[in-house]
Structure formats: structure tokens, C-alpha cells
């Protein structure tokens, strides 16, 4: 049982290999990039997009910045989890730091390129019974529909995350309400 995670349903819908270590381990984890941002690192340099758009950062350079600052996570749940993943999943036994960044990036990248490290294979390898992802009320759930229609037996479900439509101070509140109205008009409830 894992009480929390950062997974994108698109990973399981496409079941494509991850391109590099930054894609599954750094970019989707807001706990990691928040810590790094708090220490003055630019999110775009970490491979994390912003309101201005997606990042064009070089994934290896982003990983190097992460590795050079990994010490900031000492004693945190993120540090414990990542060290477990590095050791048990990727068979890495040296400490992640600036001098080992490229070694980590290369070893992880080589493994991620294999069929055993594709999203659905990892789901099955870890004996996951159900995985819940969080989506906004204005998400069309296309990736979830694709998973359900794929014939794959893995259970990836959506969990409602209403922040954008119930918090008037949320940065996307107005746009989210407009989009929600459009979706309601397009997909009216039947029999209600």
C-alpha cells in the first residue's frame, strides 16, 4: 500500500518507455522541485514546465542539478523513497551526488529503455492492485478511457481533485469554471 504517488495516466495508456531518469523521477514530483526551487534553482532548468509553457531543459543537465542538490533531501521521505528506488529498482549502490550524476542518469536510462521498465510492466512487477491518479473536474479522462479499452488488466482509476473549480482564489478558477460549463453542455447527464 502506498498512500501517495505521482503518476500520469498517460504513462499507462501509452505504455511507452521513459526517455530518461528525469521523466519519471524528477519532473512529475512537486516535492522535489519545490525544494530545489526554494533553494534558488530555476524550474525550467529542472525540466519542469511553468505557466509560461513547457521546459526546454536538457534532461541530463536537469538531472545533474538535481544530483548536485540531492543532499538537501537528507532525512526527508523523498530521500528515503528515492534511495530505496535507486538501490532496489535500479541496483545503484553509490551515493547520488554531483560526481555520480551521469552514472545514475546512464544506468537508469539503460534500464528504462528495456521492456521490463515500461509503465505497465512496472505496475505488474510491483504487484499493484489499483492505482488512483488525480484529475481535475475539467479533465476529459481520455487516458483513463484508453486504459480501460486497451484490454490490459491493470486497474488505474481517477480520483476527483476539485481544487480548480471550488477555490475562487485558485489561479485557474475562472478558466476551469468556463471549461466545466462547456463539458456539462457537451456531456449532459441522462436520467437526472
What are these regions (language model features)?
Residues 1, 5-192:
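Metal-cofactor-binding active-site regions of metalloenzymes
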Amino acid at each position: 500500500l502506498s498512500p501517495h504517488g505521482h503518476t500520469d495516466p498517460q504513462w499507462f495508456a501509452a505504455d511507452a518507455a521513459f526517455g530518461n531518469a528525469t521523466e519519471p523521477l524528477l519532473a512529475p514530483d512537486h516535492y522535489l522541485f519545490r525544494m530545489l526551487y526554494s533553494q534558488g534553482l530555476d524550474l525550467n532548468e529542472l525540466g519542469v514546465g511553468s505557466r509560461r509553457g513547457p521546459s526546454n531543459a536538457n534532461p541530463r543537465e536537469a538531472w545533474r542539478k538535481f544530483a548536485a542538490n540531492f543532499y538537501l533531501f537528507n532525512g526527508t521521505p523523498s530521500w528515503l523513497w528515492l534511495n530505496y528506488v535507486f538501490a532496489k529498482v535500479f541496483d545503484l549502490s553509490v551515493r547520488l551526488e554531483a560526481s555520480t550524476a551521469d552514472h545514475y542518469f546512464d544506468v537508469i536510462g539503460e534500464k528504462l529503455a528495456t521492456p521490463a521498465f515500461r509503465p505497465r510492466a512496472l505496475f505488474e512487477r510491483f504487484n499493484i492492485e489499483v492505482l488512483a491518479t488525480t484529475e481535475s473536474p475539467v479533465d476529459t479522462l481520455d487516458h483513463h478511457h484508453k486504459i480501460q479499452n486497451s484490454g490490459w488488466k491493470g486497474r488505474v482509476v481517477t480520483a476527483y481533485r476539485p481544487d480548480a473549480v471550488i477555490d475562487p482564489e485558485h489561479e485557474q478558477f475562472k478558466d476551469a469554471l468556463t471549461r466545466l460549463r462547456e463539458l456539462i453542455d457537451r456531456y449532459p447527464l441522462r436520467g437526472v
